[in-house]
Amino acid sequence: MKLFQQMLVAGATLSLLAPIAAQASDIVNIEEMNSYSRSKKKKTPRFDHKTFANDFSDVSNNKGDINGLEVQRNQFEAGTFSETTTMDGKAVMWAGAVDGGNEFGGSEDTQTGYTFTMNLNTSFSGDDNLYVRLKTGEQGDQWKNKYTYHIETKDNSDLLEVDKMWYTFPLGEKVTAFVGPRIENYYMYITPSIYKPGALKSFKLGGNSNFGASTDVGYGLKYELDNGIGFATNVVDKGADEGEGWFAPGNAIKWDSQIAYTTDRWHVSGTLSNARNWSAHDYNATTMGRQVARDSIGYALRAYWMPEETGTTVPEISVGYDTKSYGGVFTAGNTTQANSYMVGFTWKDMIQADDRIGIAFTQPLSATEVQGGGDTGEVGAQVWEAYYSFRPNDSMEITPAIFGGNDIAADEDDDIFGLLVTSKFKF
């Protein structure tokens, strides 16, 4: 008999024997009670100096045991988190392939990837919070390529590292301040988009031409009123913890300021992004969109709307538009202006509770003007994705997705089609 069958038989047998065992247990208990009652009638208590000495010795031994347990408890508590520290984690695994990957230096083979994340939050006053995120991951080359960059990609060769760290504290009732050696500027915004990508980072935050890839030393403020108006500003310096120090001339620095209005069902916001020596804007960009000066002024407009009820044919809608102007461009034919846009639709609770259907389209950051005038060379790049995400239980999420694009780099032949399955485990 196989092990699984033996387990089934054993379980069934135990379930049949349980009532009999319970009845037998009742009989024994009644008999023990009768025996105890008879013994009370036949015996009289007896107490002398030997009994006292023995009982006193037992008490002393028990006290010693209690003291030993107290020491062990203190040692145990010394090795645990404080009562104000919480930890949660997430493991993500995926596998997929991209047809056409060889056209932009990727691979058409089936490749996998994973990330493992641990989040620690500690409050010292009840109103503040120290956030630390530890993360590791590794993935195939096609999930690191900027054209097909997976939404969960973390490329640090299996090393568990400090990925985020900042301290948040209130300044009065409406203002929140934050400072840290590893802040991410968009974590400090009023949420600009509610579309959650199912495959590609290109769709994150409503398009990330002005957002993202900014983790480093920084600080900022966020001001939110009860009427829905909010303002956020922060600065990140990627060279502050290196030899040149804070705000050194050669450092990559990014300063973002956002103003937003948010209600229960819709949101609009505008963000000004001032970047110096900055190049981390190419997760959703064409070849011309990447070949830009390192100093820029960018504007990001975002909006979203959601229906009153989920489970209907009316989706949530998220839109984004980004434009960038580059300074210090002197070479003829180099990009001086570029823009991008994104539209995302989400249907929730359509087949089962907590599921999600997502469809999104984006034009990657593309050149609209070049130094000296003339043709930009852009051919109308487009990228799209579609996915279905469902939860087998409260801690798991499975997301099969397809995605594709045409002319994603610069040539009319740069077309791709991909598919993958992503699994998330939260704990």
PLM regions: where:
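N-terminal periplasmic/intermembrane-space "pro-region" immediately following the signal or transit peptide
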Residues: 2-104
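Outer-membrane beta-barrel proteins
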Residues: 67-82, 117-126, 170-175, 225-227, ...
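Outer membrane beta-barrel
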Residues: 84, 90, 105-240, 259-262, ...
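Sequence/structural signature of outer-membrane beta-barrel proteins
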Residues: 94-100, 139-141, 186-188, 236-246, ...
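Repeated loop/turn-to-beta-strand initiation elements of outer-membrane beta-barrel proteins
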Residues: 126-130, 174-177, 227-233, 265-270, ...
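Membrane-embedded translocation segments of transport machinery
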Residues: 222, 233-310, 323-328
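Outer-membrane beta-barrel "beta-signal"
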Residues: 415-427
